[in-house]
Design a protein with these regions (language model features):
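N-acyltransferase acceptor-side catalytic subdomain
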Residues: 1-216
Length: 216
């Protein structure tokens, strides 16, 4: 647990990620952050991503307009907000401030889904080397967060990322092939992936992206 007198900077957060730790607050109203280092870590193997036929049809139907980094502030705010079945979140004002700074520095990124110009789903996380650290997602329309995740995976594959860290394993993520690995195994995979010369794909060619989505 971090004391209030400790100044948490974007640089400290990046150094923590490189060591396998990540920050969370207990509630949206909490004034304290915790560094988490789970014994079992959730990861989503990029080479074994599972996509159902129904969801593939939804993704390729262009039901949603999918963008990246077009509205990071709105995306993280939506992730922080209570939702049906999720009355509380761990994203407090300090998390919002830190990750907004990381976005301005080029490390934190968002994937947004819109329908009729309304933001209805998305996710955000941090990219360092060949690792994308997924933080949170939200959805106010059917499959919107799932579509954002599928687009994220396609983009990470195109950019030759090596690791998608989901922090914890959930039933929602397990349907896509997410799994748990030990802390020791995670640190080994993390160290190797951080050395990869990957870069966040800012604007992949639309035809190349659609081909990547079709092959998932």
């Amino acid at each position: 647990m971090l004391r209030r007198s400790v100044r948490i900077s974007p640089d400290l957060v990046l150094r923590a990620y490189r060591q396998g730790l990540f920050p969370m607050a207990e509630t949206r109203q909490s004034h304290r952050l915790y560094w988490l280092d789970p014994e079992r870590r959730g990861v989503l193997p990029l080479d074994r991503f599972h996509l159902s036929r129904r969801l593939r049809r939804t993704v390729l139907s262009d039901l949603y307009e999918v963008t990246t980094d077009h509205d990071f502030a709105a995306t993280i705010a939506a992730c922080a907000a209570p939702a049906p079945g999720r009355p509380e979140t761990w994203i407090n004002p300090e998390i919002l401030h830190l990750f907004t700074q990381l976005h301005r520095l080029g490390y934190a990124h968002s994937v947004e889904c819109r329908r009729e110009d309304v933001l209805v789903g998305g996710l955000y996380g941090v990219a360092i080397g060949g690792v994308f650290f997924g933080e949170s997602m939200f959805s106010t329309a059917r499959d919107a967060s799932k579509v954002a995740l599928v687009h994220l995976v396609a983009r990470l594959q195109l950019a030759e990322f090596k690791l998608l860290d989901t922090q914890f394993l959930t039933a929602h993520l397990a349907q896509f092939g997410a799994e748990e690995i030990s802390r020791e195994a995670y640190r080994a995979v993390l160290a190797a992936a951080l050395e990869a010369p990957s870069a966040w794909p800012t604007a992949p060619d639309p035809e190349t992206l659609r081909a990547a989505l079709s092959q998932l």
